[in-house]
Amino acid sequence: MNSTFIKPQFKRNLNPKIGLIALATDFMIERDFNKVTKGMNIDLFVNRIHCHFPLTSENLIKMSNTVTEVSKDILPNEKLNCIVYGCTSGTIVAGYDSIKKKIKLAKPDAEVTTPSTAAINALKKMNISKISIFTPYSKKLNDQVVDYFKKENFVVTSNSYFDISNDSDIAKIDQNYLYETLLKMDLGDAEALFLSC
C-alpha cells in the first residue's frame, strides 16, 4: 500500500467568527440571530449558559458567574471577532463592565456586545431620547430595566410589563397577543419602543 503525504492548503480569508452565549432556556435567539444576519458573511457559534429560576437579580448575577467558562467553550483556543451575551436583563443587573471582563478572561481579543448595550448605542445613534419600555419580567426586574435606561439619560414616557418569572415561559407568549398588547400601549410622546426579551 502506498501512503502519500499531501500538503494541506488552508483558507486565506475566513469569515468573521461571532460567539453567542444563549440562555439554556431560550427558544428563540438562534433563529432570531440568523434572521438578522441572513446574507452576511459571518459564522455563528453558540454555547448555552445555565439559567436559574425565578428571574431575579440574585439569580441573574449567579448565572453571570459562569460567563468565562461558557465563553472558553466557544471554539476553544480559537480567536473570535465578537461575543454576544444574549441576556438583556442579565447584563443590566450584573453590569456590562462585569460581563465584558468575564468574557475577556476567556477571549481577550473578542469585542463584546449585549442586547441592552446594542440598544443603547442604536438609540443614541438615531438621536432618540424619549422611549417607552415593555418587558416580560417581574415588577422588580422591570423597574431595574427602566432605571438602567434613565441612567443612560433616556426619558421613559411609559412602561408596561407581563410579570413573568420563568424564562421558559417568556418564549411561549402568543405572538399575536403580544402584538395586540404593544399596539394598545400608551406610548406618550415616545420616539421609540424598547421591547426587552
Where are these regions (language model features)?
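Short, well-structured alpha-helical segments in soluble
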Residues: S64-E78, Y179-A190
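General beta-strand structural signal in soluble alpha/beta enzymes
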Residues: V84-Y85, E111-P115, S158-N159, F194-L195
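Short, charged beta->alpha transition segments
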Residues: T68-I74, S116-N121, V145
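Glycine-rich phosphate/diphosphate-binding loops that line cofactor/substrate pockets in enzymes
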Residues: I74-K79, I120-S129, L187
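N-terminal glycine-rich anion-binding loop in soluble enzyme alpha/beta folds
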Residues: M1-E69, F134-N142, V146-D174
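Short, acidic/small-residue loops that bind anionic groups at enzyme active sites
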Residues: K100-L123
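Active-site glycine-rich loop that binds ribose-phosphate moieties when present
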Residues: T114-A118, I173-L183
